Each structure stands twice: as C-alpha cells, then as structure tokens.
C-alpha cells in the first residue's frame, strides 16, 4: 500500500480514536493539535475528503467535522496490528474474582458483571450449551427407602437435581447396584448419547422386578434432565450503559432493549462462536439484525480442554473502544474457561 494510503489510514485511526473519546465530530485542526501526523492541516483536509468520498467517514448534518462510518470502523478493526492485553495486575484480579464464585451460576454472574464494568457496555454470557456438555458425575442418594435424589453434574459445571419416587423400597445393596449401572451408562458421555444409553439400560432391565423398576423410574426422571430442558439461557449485565450512550442509537434504543429482553437475536450471534480464543467483531449491519441496528457486538467462545461451553461478549454502540473491548472480552473468556474446567 502506498504512502498516501498509509497516511490516510493514520488519519482515519486518529478520527476513530478521537470520536470514541469525545463523541464530537472531528476536524482537521483538532487532528493536527492532538496527533503527530507529520503533515499540514491542508493535507489532512485533503485526506479527509478522500476518506469521505470512499465512505470511511461522513459529515453529520452541518458540522464542519467528520465521524467514522461503519465501513470506517471495520477498516480500523481489521487493521489493528496488535491488541494490547490487559496488565498482569488486571488479569490476576479477574482470575481471583472469578475463582471466588461458589458454583456455575455465581461464576457466570461475576463474569457478566465484571465484563460490563470493564467495557462500560452491555455484557452477555450464554450458559453452557447442553449439546456440548458431558456428564461428569452422577450421584444417587437415598432420601428414604422409596425416594431417591439424583444429582447430575456436567463437565461445564451444571448441576441438576431430581427426585425419583420408587414403586417399591430398595435396600443398600440395590442402591449401590443402581448407582453403578446408571454411572456406567452416563458418565463421560455427551448429554444426547447419555440419554440414549439410559433409555437402553431401562429397556434391557424392563420387567426385571425391583432393581429393573428402579432403573426404569430413574431413567424417566433422568431423561427430563438430559433432554427436555435444553432451552438456552442468557445472563446479562450493564444494560444501564445503553442509556448512558443513548445518543449513539438515535431512536432505536427501545428496539435494542426489546431485543435484549427477548434474547433470541443475541443468542443467535453467540451461538456462532465455536472457537475459544477467537474474538469476532460485528459492526452495525454486520449483526444482520434490524432490532439492534446501530450497535456493535464483540464476542468469543469460552471453554476448556478444546470443549466450547458457550458464547459471551458485549453489545454497545458502534462508537466503541474496540481495542480495549477486545482485550477485556478475551481475558474474561479465558479465565471463565479455566475456572470452570478446574471444577
């Protein structure tokens, strides 16, 4: 790329940085004063004219300054040479804060609150998707000789507890057999495979009396846990940050809030995240969602040991601190995966 093109990109980068910081249209005079671009104000005006003609910046109303367009933000993001990671102190603080979570729900609540504070945007975290989860452990506890508590724990930290009402009482030996049979059928399998295995086990022992009946009743309850409750869940934090940036959205703030409440659009965008460590930036119309027009979404996947648990990210105006947001999203995702993977 030629020298003139490189210089124009430096002008574009300066316009993006100043507009994000000030929310005021940027003129050539302020660029000369704030940035060491090494050229005259007249040259910068010419460069801005070219950038405007090519669609990277625009003139709002009658202002003498210019603001970045979606195309301009995309060029800026695509040419980020290196996103500066958070400092060691910041990363240790994030890790310690997340490690203090007592369970999956607490870890994710902490993550979404932390990400909203770091970026000053709306933070969203998808609960671990059931399609990728495996059964880590099944515990069977006798509450009474005819009532059992089933506890299913997945590798992503989900814990589901179910009560099984037995037709007949079972003794300690039968309880031990039941625990072993169900554990062998379920543990280490993805939920879809585990549901098939437990159904097969129930079929094999159908009509076998006491233990067979207990397996059948347990299987019915476990299938509810493994299959029937697969709705996606989303945690959200920092929605008040939208009102702080209300001017950026024009008249679309209401539709954005409605989209966040309905969750469908955000879940679709997060579901596209299939690679932990890879941050995706969607700017404006790249979200392909009319309800959140005027926003950008920075998202990634989180997981552990090559297993993706779910997606997470932030939603905010196109006038966003992209380098800082990318670094924050990447760091929080990394530590969520580490914390959940260690449990």
Curated annotation (Swiss-Prot):
What InterPro entries does this protein's entry cite? GAF-like_dom_sf, HrcA, HrcA_C, WH-like_DNA-bd_sf, WH_DNA-bd_sf, WHTH_transcript_rep_HrcA_IDD
The record's listing under Gene3D superfamilies reads: 3.30.450.40, Heat-inducible transcription repressor hrca homolog, domain 3 (3.30.390.60), Winged helix-like DNA-binding domain superfamily/Winged helix DNA-binding domain (1.10.10.10)
Q: One matching Pfam family, short form?
A: HrcA
Instruction: Kindly list the residue ranges recorded as spanning the membrane.
Output: none
**One MF term in the entry's GO annotations:** DNA binding
Tell me one GO biological process term.
Answer: negative regulation of DNA-templated transcription
Keyword line: Repressor, Stress response, Transcription, Transcription regulation
The record's family statement is:
Belongs to the HrcA family.
Protein purpose = Negative regulator of class I heat shock genes (grpE-dnaK-dnaJ and groELS operons). Prevents heat-shock induction of these operons.
Q: What is this protein called?
A: Heat-inducible transcription repressor HrcA
**Taxonomic source organism:** Mycobacterium marinum (strain ATCC BAA-535 / M)
């Amino acid at each position: 790329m030629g020298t003139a093109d490189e210089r124009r990109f430096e002008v574009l980068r300066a316009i993006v940085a100043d507009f994000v910081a000030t929310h005021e249209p940027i003129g050539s005079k302020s660029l000369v004063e704030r940035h060491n671009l090494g050229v005259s104000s007249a040259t910068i005006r010419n460069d801005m004219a070219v950038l405007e003609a090519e669609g990277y910046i625009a003139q709002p109303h009658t202002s003498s300054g210019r603001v970045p367009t979606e195309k301009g933000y995309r060029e800026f993001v695509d040419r980020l040479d290196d996103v500066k990671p958070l400092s060691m102190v910041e990363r240790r603080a994030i890790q310690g804060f997340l490690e203090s979570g007592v369970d999956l729900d607490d870890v994710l609540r902490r993550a979404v609150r932390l990400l909203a504070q770091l970026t000053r945007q709306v933070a969203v975290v998808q609960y671990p998707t059931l399609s990728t989860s495996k059964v880590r452990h099944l515990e069977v506890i006798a509450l009474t000789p005819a009532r059992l508590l089933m506890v299913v724990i997945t590798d992503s930290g989900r814990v589901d507890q179910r009560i099984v009402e037995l037709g007949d009482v079972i003794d300690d030996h039968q309880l031990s057999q039941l625990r072993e049979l169900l554990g062998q059928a379920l543990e280490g399998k993805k939920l879809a495979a585990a549901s098939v295995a437990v159904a097969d086990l129930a079929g094999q022992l159908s009509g076998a009396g006491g233990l067979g009946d207990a397996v059948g009743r347990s299987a019915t309850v476990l299938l509810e846990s493994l299959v029937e409750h697969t709705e996606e869940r989303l945690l959200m934090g920092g929605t008040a940050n939208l009102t702080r940036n209300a001017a950026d959205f024009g008249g679309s703030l209401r539709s954005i809030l409605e989209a966040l409440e309905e969750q469908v659009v955000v879940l679709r965008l997060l579901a596209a995240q299939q690679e932990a460590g890879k941050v995706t930036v969607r700017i404006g119309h790249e979200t392909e969602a009319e309800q959140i027009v005027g926003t950008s979404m920075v998202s990634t996947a989180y997981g552990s040991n090559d297993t993706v648990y779910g997606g997470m990210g932030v939603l905010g105006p196109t006038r966003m601190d992209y380098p800082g947001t990318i670094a924050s999203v990447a760091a929080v995702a990394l530590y969520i995966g580490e914390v959940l993977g260690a449990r």
